[in-house]
Each structure stands twice: as C-alpha cells, then as structure tokens.
C-alpha cells in the first residue's frame, strides 16, 4: 500500500484547471489503487504563514527562546515535514502565476526546507534527506511556455524537489488554457491522458 499526498495551490478553487486535474488524478488513482491512502492539502484554502524575519528564527537551530508565533510556525513546519516524509507519492498541482508558482506553494516550500531536517550540507555539497519519493507535478498555464525561457515553474520545481532529495519527478502540462474553449478542452484532455499513463505505470 502506498500513501499519496496531494498539494493544491490554486486560488481559483473549483474554477482552477490545476485543481480539476488534481481531482481527476485522485479519482483515477483511487480506481487503480483502491487500497492506497490519499491525503489532500489545499494550500490556498488553508494557507501556511509567510516566512518573515521573526519566523525564520524558529526554523534555524538556536538556543534563543521562541516567541509564541515562532513556536506555532515550528510546530507547523514539523507537521508538514512529517506529513511529507510519511507519503510515498507527492502530487503537486502548480498553476503558473506570472511565470512562476503560486505564493501559497512557495510559502509551503519555505516551511519544509530546513537544514538538518529535509536537507543537509556536506563536504561534497548539499544532500537531500527526503528520499524514496516519487513526485508528479500537474501544471496549468494560460499560454504556451513548456521548453521556453518563460517557463520558470518546471526548472524551479525540479531544482527544489531535487535539493530536498526527490529526484523521481514527472511533469504533466495543461497549456494554452486561455487561448479559447477548444484549446482549453484539448489541454485538459491531453493532461488527463498523461495522468492516466502515470497512474497506470
């Protein structure tokens, strides 16, 4: 039995293309892997705090006493990391906002990227500590950006996930959804076909 963690980050709720794709993924995964456990965390509906000058002090080793707000942030960070480590498949629904990922997803990454916990520095360089995972990124875009300099989502997510130890990463693209109904329908159809292939793999 595998455990699947689905991270949603779109601010558009039910109107979101990436949320629709993640919902489709969950449906298909449950159909093919009925014994598996699926956890869905919606980072837009239930946002995590923005890392600031106070909160960053909670995530770095220190003997200084923590403020109540820092204690809350550290507890949440511990919870998010434990959740991430407990799952085998990580599904990230990441729409493109202004060429990059949503703020809500970046805030999540800022709380799970902790030196000595999810990565560490060695004499040979950084080493990821979140290992043995498979990641699937479902990314929707209004325009066409794949394999062009305007796609900052793909390289950033590949880099971040690899940095914390997740190197088995597949991307599913739904592009051109703002180019009209016909293009949007085709983008969804192609993305769902790609999801079907990954779910069955």
From Swiss-Prot:
Q: Which gene encodes it?
A: azoR
State the needed cofactors, names only.
Answer: FMN
As recorded in UniProt, its EC number(s) are: 1.6.5.-, 1.7.1.17
Superkingdom field:
Bacteria
**Span of the secretion signal?**
none
Query: Which chemical reaction does it catalyze?
Result: 2 a quinone + NADH + H(+) = 2 a 1,4-benzosemiquinone + NAD(+); N,N-dimethyl-1,4-phenylenediamine + anthranilate + 2 NAD(+) = 2-(4-dimethylaminophenyl)diazenylbenzoate + 2 NADH + 2 H(+)
Under PANTHER family, the record lists: FMN-DEPENDENT NADH-AZOREDUCTASE 1, FMN-DEPENDENT NADH:QUINONE OXIDOREDUCTASE
Name of this protein = FMN-dependent NADH:quinone oxidoreductase
Question: Tell me, what is one Gene Ontology molecular-function annotation carried by this entry?
Answer: oxidoreductase activity, acting on NAD(P)H, quinone or similar compound as acceptor
